[in-house]
């Protein structure tokens, strides 16, 4: 049974076409992976099917009485809301019924016999509905999911605006799972999640009986949980039955077949044109030449899509720093309360270190304390000599209305326009992306613009806070290669072992230093 039908969908932003005349269907129980490079339109597609965005052309049709739950990579939480309040809001329809039930109870004292009968009938109906939907176990359900995603230890009364990006993602995900929709729409749910909770989500989705559509660049995760792949590329959307690994094999074969057919056809076209040119003027061969020309005119010419630029990251190494890059002396990090025990850490030239641990444990706080961006609660951090620091921040707040070109030019005013465009193109951005405002780009494209700033300046130590979030497969591969080849030192926060294990030579586990209990 089809839950969702999308027919002849066309959409773009200005003169930038996203997809053209695409169709899509979602059947009951299908676990779909929606894949494609950054900027191909995956999140745009999700916004269209959820009604957040109207398409230029086409039809989106949901089955009747289908409840779809959407985890948006750009969703926000309002100040003043608590973790527990957000999670309980998953049950708002039931809570409203409870409120109506309480109103009825208040009205019973003043009701005449006829009103009493009507109110009692309504009261019974509401009580049956609440019992059917396990209303009286709401608190237990909230606690169960909060514990599974590590939210219980943060405190259900905590304001959501005090949370890190990863913690906010967990809150939104927990709320969505508590709603138990007929279909889950998940846009990069593993971004910011640590290994333990990615594993929990993987188990949850494997056991999930209903349908879901999942956008993710986490290939091991995709391979485990999906059974259908929809691939978005060159304004097209193509379906393949199987996991991502199977899709890659089929995609490579189809691409090779198309390229071979293109070469054969180009050879044939060349030979036909040559024959026509040599024989159209001669009376004896004119008819044969006209026949060949007709064949040319009727030929359905194969066109190969223009190759998208693949990112080629390369970090420039500056001057050689001193032996010690930084040393901490009884450093205690945190904001109102300590997040760490007194830390005595040191990093030497040549070290490449992964900083790991659960969300909210203080990894970003430690990085910012080392850089002096936030004050420590006590203790000191002493930076070494001749440091040229490159810092990639996990979250950049606020809307950036500058274009990509302006963004890079502000950072490197001596660059010519050609050099700016070339620098952005090397990061995998097309001309259309380069001329767009940063705020309209996908999360992955925005990350590439920020990486462009980093790779074009001399550094001898990189401090990177979750640089793989939002990046597509090609960009991740290129970034990993660039970090492996980088001659400087690296302190890297990353939740993907398959990324950092081949880059670093040491792992620092924050769980050994935290004051928090998880």
What residue spans do the PLM features occupy?
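ABC ATP-binding cassette signature C-motif
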Residues: 1-260, 309, 318-518
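Intracellular alpha-helical coupling/juxtamembrane segments of multi-pass membrane proteins
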Residues: 250-305
